[in-house]
Design a protein with these regions (language model features):
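N-terminal propeptides/low-complexity segments immediately following signal peptides
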Residues: 10-47, 341-344
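Active-site-adjacent loops and short helices of periplasmic peptidoglycan-processing enzymes
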Residues: 43-217, 221-230, 287
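Bacterial N-terminal signal peptides
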Residues: 1-6
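Penicillin-recognizing serine hydrolase domain
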Residues: 16-20, 50, 54-81, 180-345
Length: 345
């Protein structure tokens, strides 16, 4: 049997039987549409990939923080912070070093220098000063719980700057300083020079300006110097602070949760964060009976600097024989050059 096959064109094929010009236009439109679709697809894929990368980084940072609970102190000490320095405050022995001489924005770690300049100046800590429009953050647009017109003593402003990292408090200390903000900044930089902080520069009293830069090595010197001030030690390690604002009590918590952790004996603390600086944390703490200065800079993720600090504590406690604590008054920090990639145990 011979079966005859009749070829019936598909509708699309039949529709394509049009004048050549029209077919050319249709093909061009199709190619343009296909190209547009590919570009859109690539953009969507790239966007999704970027978003996924951010999520993975955040997840990784959180995991690193919580992983500190499982860290045994035996395996090599590896920190997430991009720049870090851990030293014995008594002996200057370097426990851990990572990019110690790399200049980086330091955010609110700046406020330790702000407090030292005020305390060195001899101005009355009980004198009330006023928060004005000049203290509003127009650079980063950060909020504040201190309304314009708030009157507080310099002592209260120091506490708010060091405990809650209140930017208007730190700003008001500078704007109301004899000679004004410019003179205050000059004295911040003069103090840095006197401490041997050769890679440090200050442009404001809050740390919101990313041109406030320093290194892990310089900040170890600053932490050691700040530790000599009772006011700074007491304020920076206070877990919370209450003041009256507009005739109402206001409660401020310390930005470093470790001061509320019974596993830690902290003698000085300051956190910092702006996008350019990453998460920063500097501390003086007793570890295995020894005074240790910890500088953690440019850490990604809200929890990673805390995880790093916990890993440092466990490593030191596991690898150091407890020794009697020595007198810490005026212990100089004179660090030499450190290999930027070195990990010294």
């Amino acid at each position: 049997m011979v079966v005859g096959l009749v070829l019936v064109p598909f509708e699309s094929e039949a529709a394509s039987k049009k004048p050549r010009k029209s077919a050319t236009v249709s093909t061009a439109k199709h190619k343009a549409s296909a190209k547009s679709s590919r570009i859109k697809s690539q953009r969507v894929t790239k966007y999704k990939s970027s978003r996924m990368s951010v999520k993975l980084r955040k997840s990784s940072a959180i995991n690193q923080a919580y992983a500190a609970d499982d860290y045994d102190g035996i395996s090599p000490l590896n920190l997430a912070s991009a720049k870090a320095l851990v030293i014995n405050q008594n002996t200057n022995e370097i426990i851990y070093a990572k990019n110690t001489n790399a200049p980086t924005p330091i955010a609110s770690v700046t406020k330790l220098m702000t407090a030292m300049v005020i305390l060195d100046s001899g101005v009355s800590l009980q004198e009330e000063v006023t928060v004005t429009n000049a203290d509003v953050d127009y650079l980063k647009g950060t909020s504040s719980r201190l309304p314009i017109g708030t009157r507080l003593t310099r002592d209260e402003l120091i506490n708010l700057a060091l405990i809650a990292s209140e930017n208007r408090a730190a700003s008001a200390l500078a704007t109301t300083y004899p000679g004004g903000r410019a003179q205050f900044i000059r004295e911040m930089n003069q103090k840095a020079i006197s401490l041997g902080m050769v890679n440090t520069h200050f442009s404001d009293s809050t740390g919101l300006d990313s041109s406030n830069v320093s290194t892990a090595e310089d900040l170890a010197k600053m932490v050691n110097a700040a530790y000599q001030y009772d006011v700074i030690r007491n304020a920076s390690t206070t877990s919370s602070y209450d003041v009256y604002l507009s005739n109402r009590p206001a409660h401020f918590n310390n930005t470093n949760s470790l001061v509320r952790n019974s596993d830690w004996v902290i003698g000085l603390s300051k956190t910092g964060f702006i996008n350019e600086a990453g998460r920063c944390l500097v501390m003086q703490a007793q570890l295995a009976g020894e005074p240790v200065i910890i500088v953690l800079l440019d850490s990604f993720g809200k929890y990673s600097r805390i995880g790093d600090a916990n890993r440092v504590r466990k490593w030191v406690e596991h690898n150091t024989e407890p020794k009697p604590t020595q007198d810490l008054d005026a212990v100089p920090i004179t660090l030499g050059q450190v290999d930027s990639t070195a990990q010294l145990n």
